[in-house]
Amino acid sequence: MMLLLPLLAVFLVKRSHTRTHSLRYFRLAVSDPGPVVPEFISVGYVDSHPITTYDSVTRQKEPKAPWMAENLAPDHWERYTQLLRGWQQTFKAELRHLQRHYNHSGLHTYQRMIGCELLEDGSTTGFLQYAYDGQDFIIFNKDTLSWLAMDYVAHITKQAWEANLHELQYQKNWLEEECIAWLKRFLEYGRDTLERTEHPVVRTTRKETFPGITTFFCRAHGFYPPEISMTWMKNGEEIAQEVDYGGVLPSGDGTYQTWLSVNLDPQSNDVYSCHVEHCGRQMVLEAPRESGDILRVSTISGTTILIIALAGVGVLIWRRSQELKEVMYQPTQVNEGSSPS
């Protein structure tokens, strides 16, 4: 069974040069909590930056970003502390309800993700979904005001939730209007952090991965925002079917990393190059003819190319698990309120 913690949430980012922003809230209930994992956790993110947190140990909603603490009054935190204490009890009851219907005992998890995205062209998206033991359980479709059930238990929940038209419309309005309004507000609070630009360091590596098979890697790291476009070109033409892609993932220092690779016959005379675009900055690196790396460092003042003979450079790859959650047979009576929690 997979245990997913919102505090460790990793977001995959679309491989694109179009800048987007998102607001997400995760809730997690655990049936058998311990000293490391609380019974209930709620965490909020703008993009990949934690902004709020609450858990069943502290029983307080608290800011995780200084620009949240500076801009929201104490009564905001107290109001949503009270709401989350209610959600804590609701999630605990709902998880027990699910365990009974699945005939489960022991350690199990119940998760919820709600949020929205603001795209560069001004368009928006919204999402609300739930999971049990890390697997999709039920997903809200705001356009049809309906729920997509993933199994027989979720289908019972679907029938109950779809009977409450007021709640369906409320969720749609929250996703399309209130969530976006709060996202724009938070983006203004954290402008210096969220609107900054750090261009990537890009490296190409040639390595024999199997006898008779050579792999070219193109790696980018140290960039923000996370939207980036990377492609391999062969003899001047883009290739896609032969390419393996890594996710765009946090590096742990407020920047991101990603990679892509392509296999080839080492006897081939084809010329491969990696093309990278990030926030209007374009970089092109040819694949090395011999084992080693070609490193390009992109800075605000210009681009410097360094040739470095390095072998076997590793990269930490994070794999994203879905962050979802919730289920119940009667729609919850704990209202989200005018602000996300």
UniProtKB/Swiss-Prot annotation:
N-glycosylated. InterPro entries: Ig-like_dom (IPR007110), Ig-like_dom_sf (IPR036179), Ig-like_fold (IPR013783), Ig/MHC_CS (IPR003006), Ig_C1-set (IPR003597), MHC_class-I_related (IPR050208), MHC_I-like_Ag-recog (IPR011161), MHC_I-like_Ag-recog_sf (IPR037055). Highly expressed thymus. Expressed in liver, kidney, spleen, heart, brain, lung, skeletal muscle and testis. 2-amino-4-oxopteridine-6-carbaldehyde binds at K61. The keyword Lipid metabolism does not apply. Changing Y110I: Impair expression of folded protein. 7-hydroxy-6-methyl-8-(1-D-ribityl)lumazine binds at R27, S42, K61, R112, Y170, Q171. Residues 290-296 are annotated as: Connecting peptide. Residues 19-197 are annotated as: Antigen-binding cleft. 8-(9H-purin-6-yl)-2-oxa-8-azabicyclo[3.3.1]nona-3,6-diene-4,6-dicarbaldehyde binds at Y25, R27, K61, H76, R112. 5-(2-oxoethylideneamino)-6-(D-ribitylamino)uracil binds at R27, S42, K61, R112, Y170, Q171. Changing C279G: No effect on cell surface expression. Changing R27V: Loss of MAIT cell activation. Changing L128Q: Impair expression of folded protein. It is found in: Cell membrane; Endoplasmic reticulum membrane; Golgi apparatus membrane; Early endosome membrane. The keyword rRNA processing does not apply. Residues 318-341 are cytoplasmic. GO terms for cellular component: early endosome membrane; endoplasmic reticulum; endoplasmic reticulum membrane; Golgi membrane; late endosome membrane; MHC class I protein complex; plasma membrane. One of its GO terms (biological process) is defense response to Gram-positive bacterium. 5-(2-oxopropylideneamino)-6-(D-ribitylamino)uracil binds at R27, S42, K61, R112, Y170, Q171. Disruption phenotype: Mutant mice lack invariant MAIT cells due to impaired thymic selection. They show normal development of T, B and NK cells. Antigen-presenting molecule specialized in displaying microbial pyrimidine-based metabolites to alpha-beta T cell receptors (TCR) on innate-type mucosal-associated invariant T (MAIT) cells. In complex with B2M preferentially presents riboflavin-derived metabolites to semi-invariant TRAV1 TCRs on MAIT cells, guiding immune surveillance of the microbial metabolome at mucosal epithelial barriers. This is Major histocompatibility complex class I-related protein 1. The lineage of its organism: Eukaryota, Metazoa, Chordata, Craniata, Vertebrata.
